[in-house]
Amino acid sequence: MTRMPAAAHDIRVRKAEVTDAGAIAALVNQAFLVERFFVDGDRTDPDEVRELMARSGFLCAEIEGELVGCVFVEVRGARGYFGMLSVSPQRQKLGIGRFLVDQTEAFFRAAGCAAVDIKIVHLRRDLPPFYRALGYRETGTEPFDDDSLTQAAHFVLMSKPL
């Protein structure tokens, strides 16, 4: 558990539990509403969150017991991968996302990872500058084939050494 004061709040980061699956799915879907211009439907559901938890896990950020952020984390050998970074729309622009990335990187360092990988949808033009400012660099692209897409998209792969 890690605490950090941000915008006069105390943020607590913890490993998610299976009982958090519904709240995580709801938060991710809220945060990913900004992608409705290119994808139809919800980003995830509680069943998928539970499946991801069984494979790896999520970190949760809370303020006074309220779930305000989460991120999927997975150790892949000497590399870490994170995705579904989500912050409650009412709590964005307060540094919670940046803090959650910092805590995610600390999680991977503790697991012995030498680098972190992410992938972002190229249509989200706000994301590359955010991650570049945190030290991530583009390493390639990957197809994004999904029936829920309403327009063509691909992933931009980014990496950061730890």
Description of each model-found segment:
Residues 66, 88-102, 111, 122-129, ...:
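Conserved glycine-rich acetyl-CoA-binding loop
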Residues 50, 58, 114-162:
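C-terminal "cap" of GNAT-fold acetyltransferases
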Residues 37-39, 95, 150:
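Short, solvent-exposed loop/turn segments at secondary-structure boundaries
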Residues 3-6, 11, 15-90, 101-103, ...:
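Acetyl-CoA-dependent GNAT
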